[in-house]
Every structure is written in C-alpha cells, then in structure tokens.
Amino acid sequence: MAVARSSRSAAATPRSGAEIRAAFLSFYEERGHKVMASASLIPEDPTVLLTIAGMLPFKPVFLGQQKRPAPRATSSQKCIRTNDIENVGRTARHHTFFEMLGNFSFGDYFKQQAIEWAWELSTDLFGIDPKHLVVSVFREDDEAEQIWRDVVGVNPKRIIRMDEADNFWASGPTGPCGPCSEIYYDFNPELGDEGIDLEDDDRFIEFYNLVFMQYNRDAEGTLTPLANRNIDTGLGLERMAQILQKVPNNYETDLIFPLIQAAADLAGVDYHQLDDAGQTSLKVIGDHSRAVTQLICDGVSASNLGRGYILRRLLRRVVRHGRLLGIHQPFLVTMGQASIALLKDAYPSVIERQEVILAELQREESRFLETLERGEKLLADVLESKPKQISGAQAFELYDTYGFPLELTQEIAEEHGLDVDLAGFEQAMEQQRQRAKAAAVSIDLTLQDAIDQVAADLNATSFEGYDLLVQSSSTVQALLVNGEAAASASDGDVVQVVLDNTPFYGEGGGQVGDRGLLVGDGPDGNGLIVVIEGVSRNRGVFVHSGRVQLGRLGVGDVVHGQVDRACRRRAQANHTATHLLQAALKQVVDEGIGQAGSLVNFERLRFDFHCPRAVKPEELEQIETLINGWISDAQSLEVNEMAIDQAKAAGAVAMFGEKYADVVRVVDVPGVSMELCGGTHVGNTAEIGLFKIVSESGVAAGIRRIEAVAGASVLAYLNEREVVVKQLGDRFKAQPGEIVERVVALQEELKNSQKALTAARSELAVAKSAALAVQAVAVGKHQLLVARLDGVNGDGLQGAALGLLDQLGDATAVVLGGLPDPSDQGKVILVAAFGKAVIATGQQAGKFIGAIAKLCGGGGGGRPNLAQAGGRDGAALDAALNTARAELKKTLG
C-alpha cells in the first residue's frame, strides 16, 4: 500500500534556505522529535578535530556512553569537512562548511517509519514530484527495498542496490553499524528508468541519507542484532536549496550566492560573465568565507596545528583566490561582515562574536599578505624557467624560508600544468628535522637517561602532599649522585632521590615542584639534611633534586620530608588565582577562551590563552576587580575526585588535547570556576590576599599571555612601581599626580611638529610636481608622465599625482616613484593616477602599479584611477620607472 500524499500548494512550498531549515525542524517536531540546537564546530570527541556530520554530537548516545536527550530528536547541525577541499568550487556540491538537517531515533521508531517520513517530507512538504526521485539500498537489505516498493510505492526500477562502500555505515572497525538508504534527485527523469547510474553527478544528486543502526560488529567481523536499534539521518540543506530554488549548483542558492556577489563586487567582475576559473575562485571565496566565520565564532584561532591550521589554510585560500580575481587590497573583513549578515538570523552568536571574528580575519590576512608577496616572487622566478616539475627542494624553500604553504604551491603549480615533487619535499623536511635535532642543546643528557632508567624500574610514587607538608616517614627507593646511580651520598653531593611516598609536589600542570628538606638520623646516627631545590615527575615517579647538606644518605634509608611552607603557600595562591583568571577572562572577554598553557611558580603566574585580539585596558581592569572581589568573598574551595564523564557533565573545564584518566580531580570555586586539575590550591580564596595583573601581550598567532602576581608578591611589585614613578617625577620635575599631564603635553608638542613636517613635505611635493608637468610626453592621443620624486611620503606623492593629472588632462597617465627618506634604500613608494581616457584603453592603475612594484621587491594596488604600492629595493627604482614608461608607451601608443 503506497503512502498517501496530501495536496500542498506551490506557494506554500519552502524555497529559501531559512524556510527549508524551519520546515524540516517543524515537520519532525510535529512528529514527537525534540529540536536540538546545533552543537559547536569544536566537538567534545577528542578523536575528531571538527564536527563533520550531523550525528557527531549524538555519537556518545548511539554508542551507549551517554543518556539519550529524548527518544526522538531533530537538528540543523553546522559541519566542516576539508577532505575534498580541492573540489570546492569545481563541482556543483562540494563545500567546506555545510548544514546537515537530521532526524534521530534512539531506540524508538525504526526503518519503516524513517522511510515513510523521509518520503512524505520530500514529496509533500518540499513538493518534489516522485518522478524526480530515485532511492538506493544496501545490496543485502531486502527489508528496506520491500518498504520502498510495497509501502511507499516507489517504482522498482528506481530502487538501486549498492555495495557496502556506498550503503553501509559503521562508527569504526567494531561497534554499532548498519545499512543505509539514500534518496537522490533526478534532474533528467525523461532519460528513463533503464540502466540508472547514480554515479552520474550531472543527472543525480543525493540529498537525504537514512542510516539504520541495527547491528553490532565484533573484532572478528561478526554482526549481531542490537537490542536497541537507532535511526540517524542527514539531509543536506545546501543540496535541497539547489533543488527547490532550481539553480545549477549549490553555490547559486541564497545560502552562498550573496557572498559570491560580495566578492564579485570587490573584484569588479560579473560572476555570470566569468570563465570557469574565475567562477571557481568566487565560489571558493563564498564557501570559505562562511566556514572561517563559523570556525572563529566557535573559538578557533589560526595557527600551525590542528583545527587552527585548517582555519589558516581556508583563510589563505580565500586571499589567494581573491588575488587571482584582481583583489589586491585586504578584503577578508569585508567578506566577514557579509558572512555575518548572511548567517546572523540562523546563528545569532556570529553577531555576539563579531568583534573577535573580524579582528582575527584582519590579523591573519595581514600576516599572510606579507608571506604571499615574498613567496609568489620566488615561485614566479621558478616558473619562469619553465620546469617540468616544482622540485621538492624548491617547495621546501618556499615553505621553510618564506612560510609559503605547500598546498598553495601545489595549487599554483597545477594552474601552470605542473605538479610538486612531494617525496622530495618530505625528504627535505626530514633533513631539516635531523639538522634541528643535531643542533639542539640538551642539558646533561646523561643525567636524563639515568633518571629515565631509574623511573622505568620503579613503581609510581604515592603523593601525600595534598594533606601533608611534613611527613612521618618514607623510604629511599633509588639514588643518583652527580648523575650516576649510587648506593649512598655524602656531604656536598648533588643528588636525585626517589622515595616510595612524598609530600613534595612534582612539577606538572604548569605548577613548579616544591622546595624543602629531607631529614633523618643518617646511617651513623649523626643526622641527615638534604636540601630539595625542585621535584620533577617521570612516568609517575617523583624525582627530588637537591644537595646533601649534612650527613650521609643511602638507598633504603628512612627519611622525613618537610615541604617549605612559605613556597607552597605562594605557589598554591598563584595556582588558584590562575583558575580565577581563566574564569574572569571567560566572563569579561569571551566565553570561548581556552587555555593554551600556564606557569605557576613562587613569585608570579603566567596564563596563555586562545584569543585573536589584545585584551583591552578596561577589560583588564574589570578582570582585576572581579578576581579581587572573589578573593574578598572568602569562598572555600571544594576538591573532589570523580569519573571524567561526570566531571565534564558537571561543567568542569578541561584543557583541549590533554589526556585525562578515567577518574579525575576537580577543583571547584563554587559559582566561579570548576576545572580538572592535579595541582595544589588554597583552601579559601581569602588566602590569596590580593591579585594584580602585571602585563598582557601576544606570544604567538592567536595566543595572548597575561602575567600577574598575588599575595605578598603584589606588595613587592607595587614597591618596584613606586620607585619608577619617583624616577619619572624627578625627571619631569613633577609630583606623581602631574606626570601624566606632563607626558600628554610633550606628546601634543611632538604631534604638532609631525603635522607641520607633513604639511611642509606636501607643499614641497606640490611645488616639485608643478615643475614636473613639462616632462610629460605625448603618446598617441594621450599624455604620459613618469618621474621620480624623493623625500615625499605616500600622501604627498598621491597628492602630487592627482595635481599633475588635473593639470595635464583626462587623457593622461601619471606614474611617480620615490624614496620617502632618501637615506633609506629599503623603502620605496610608487603611485599611479590614470585619467578616464587611459582607463578606457583597458589600463587600471591598481593592477599596473602592483606589477611595477614587484620589480622593487614589493606589491600593492588600489582603484582603476588611483593606486599606491610599496617596495623594499630602492636600487631597483629607476629601472622599475623605466619599465613603467616603456609599458605605457606600448599600450597607449
């Protein structure tokens, strides 16, 4: 019996991306599904860099590791995939960022209901004529075929059996798995039902995948039925938009095309008039702009590792394809703004994170433009020799010396019909690793080897220092004297001591090891004192480093550990303050901030965190106030051990990439901070005393650092500042309260002097340029003036060029170049100003001056009528101007 379709007017059929998304979720909500918000692109699953599928947030539920949120759920999940990045823009349907609409059953309904609803959604809600639909089933899934044929009523000729590679889903080599069934849209049903080939991408597009999780696969590959069978489906929003909006590809839907149009406007081109290469570049920019906006919004910062590298790669591809279209000025911020405008209704978080998104785009583009100019120049030199292949050594030089990504070298090579010797590249990379390894300076390798050997032969040390600072007794398990294993040590010996249990904290989690004493009777009863200067860990074994101050120490001796209380108090105050700092940063700056590293010692603390911009002074002030408020609240800390899943469910903050045991230690400042942490802490926030931020700075791309002091160290810091203030007061002959006023007055004087100097330079440029007009020469129907003008800055040179253009008329091309500071050959400025009649010949000032600037080791660009570029080789300026003159004579003549 076929499933009935209710009539639905064409006007009511969803068309826009937003309508399709809302209609899908409403359809399943009406059928008892709980609507779930999209999860972050940064998954909780540590085995996956990014959220790559709609089911990924539910994977722990499917695997039985987590309680189901409801028997039925539906979502629109944002996803990122980069495994087919080279196909983005070249095919009709490959993307990096996409939205996956899905409906899920956790042990509730199963195959027949999922199939019936999928068909009803496609044909009734979305109004697709069944003659345009084809379904696939797993070759052994007779049940699914029977449902499609006998229950839904699909023509048997339009039910295609597929192999395991296409229609069988598995979470891994073992575990839950099952067959799947897919619905395809047929763009050309008039071609008939005979010999249907679903691999024909021009005719068919798969838009809905239904996974029937009904088996468990064991290590031998045996399939056994699951007690609770599940449904996992995915419908591609972009693909459905293409179908319903009747456009040639996903890129021309309202989900992406506004970004393509924004990029086309920046490039001054018409998408529909471009060749395939030009359209591909616009599609890449449109696709990647959505992806990078969402990645940054969810807390990813560009870097050379993991998901940060994926973001950096996408950003650099956008810039690269922009340049192929003639966009030489920075434009990522503009594309970011367009992306935010397009995404904000579905994802309001992009508005909340707008400042962070745009700052990261601007910072990363600025860095890459410098890299790109250097790398493209070298690569152009390589290509000029017309090689058959880019050698591995050349690709590695681009990567190692110029920071030019290998993927970009491959792309540019492909554009010229070449490939890259990847084996040679890897060989050069390995040689570099070996050179770095050989050059590395390692302190006392023999000692480290000895410690490794000792640690390998012993059981882990029992740490008792959370509760004890003075120990009743412990036994010496092993001893190193001056770097070598020994049975005993005496006065003056430098030692490494391993005990069976210890109150000393071993360095870890950013916190330094404790200091203190080991005391005992000694073998001769005359006493023993070992001064411990640091404690490290090696495979769970605590190694106490120090010097024997009195007596003799031997393996098997009983000693008593005494931790330096003052040092421990300072370290644990700084450690708890670090937790408060992270909590305050999340509250004041951005909830998505994550720890990148930390150092907690006896004097101060240092906290590194992912953030694309500097923390503002007013934010630092807020953070200080917030932390000191929490200190004043005198809150008692709660420390508990619990299962890792329980800790995460409770909201405990974990450091990404860190490996944790099944049972973890959770340090909780109630209502303020909860973190997984093995370090030592104060019992009450009041013990910290006071907190003061010393500095905020950048340490790497997307990584900021705050250094701070707490407790008694704050007083020492303030005393140092007081000395500095006194010295400044003496220097300016001012009281402390007058120093700022004096400095502001001096700055104003300097500013006025700089303005006067700039004005004088501009006047000089105008005066000099008036005299240059006589150097103009007639070239056909045009006037051409190419001249050198040193001692003038960029604004002055532009003003001079425009003045000459006004003086000589609309049929004039003016090119000026010079050294702003004649004594500095490392900075060149070039300006081009073209009249309308010159532009009408096809010349554009921006493209022209950018090409000339490359001759001076630089680059730049601008508008068709006025553009400025820079260079780094003053010695090449005259030759560059001669080239400009010759090129324009040839073009305008």
Curated annotation (Swiss-Prot):
GO cellular component: cytosol
Record's keyword annotation contains ATP-binding: yes
Cofactor binding mode and count: Binds 1 zinc ion per subunit.
Broad class of where this protein is predominantly found: cytoplasm
InterPro entries: aa-tRNA-synth_II/BPL/LPL (IPR045864), Ala-tRNA-lgiase_IIc (IPR002318), Ala-tRNA-ligase_IIc_anticod-bd (IPR018162), Ala-tRNA-synth_IIc_core (IPR018165), Ala-tRNA-synth_IIc_N (IPR018164), Ala-tRNA_ligase (IPR050058), Ala_tRNA_ligase_euk/bac (IPR023033), DHHA1_dom (IPR003156)
Enzyme class per UniProt: ligase
CDD domains reported for this sequence: AlaRS_core
Keywords: Aminoacyl-tRNA synthetase, ATP-binding, Cytoplasm, Ligase, Metal-binding, Nucleotide-binding, Protein biosynthesis, RNA-binding, tRNA-binding, Zinc
Keyword S-adenosyl-L-methionine part of the UniProt annotation: no
Catalysed reactions, as listed in the record: tRNA(Ala) + L-alanine + ATP = L-alanyl-tRNA(Ala) + AMP + diphosphate
Cofactor: Zn(2+)
Binding site for Zn(2+): 575, 579, 677, 681
UniProt subcellular location: Cytoplasm
Domain notes: Consists of three domains; the N-terminal catalytic domain, the editing domain and the C-terminal C-Ala domain. The editing domain removes incorrectly charged amino acids, while the C-Ala domain, along with tRNA(Ala), serves as a bridge to cooperatively bring together the editing and aminoacylation centers thus stimulating deacylation of misacylated tRNAs.
Similarity-based family: Belongs to the class-II aminoacyl-tRNA synthetase family.
Protein's UniProt name: Alanine--tRNA ligase
Organism: Synechococcus sp. (strain CC9311)
